[in-house]
């Protein structure tokens, strides 16, 4: 799977602020809200979920 420039940008944003990376990829879907909860509970789970969402879609 080839990465585009926007994918790399979203990955960098996801490391800094995970919910924003998910929002840029999926919009205001359930993945966004799940990521907000995971980021509040722990920063690392939020990053892992954000990277999963970005790399999957």
UniProtKB/Swiss-Prot annotation:
Belongs to the UPF0057 (PMP3) family. GO terms for cellular component: plasma membrane. Keywords: Cell membrane, Membrane, Transmembrane, Transmembrane helix. The chain crosses the membrane at residues 3-23, 34-54. This is Plasma membrane proteolipid 3. It is found in: Cell membrane. It is a multi-pass membrane protein. The lineage of its organism: Eukaryota, Fungi, Dikarya, Ascomycota, Saccharomycotina. Plays a role in the regulation of membrane potential. Could mediate a proton leak.
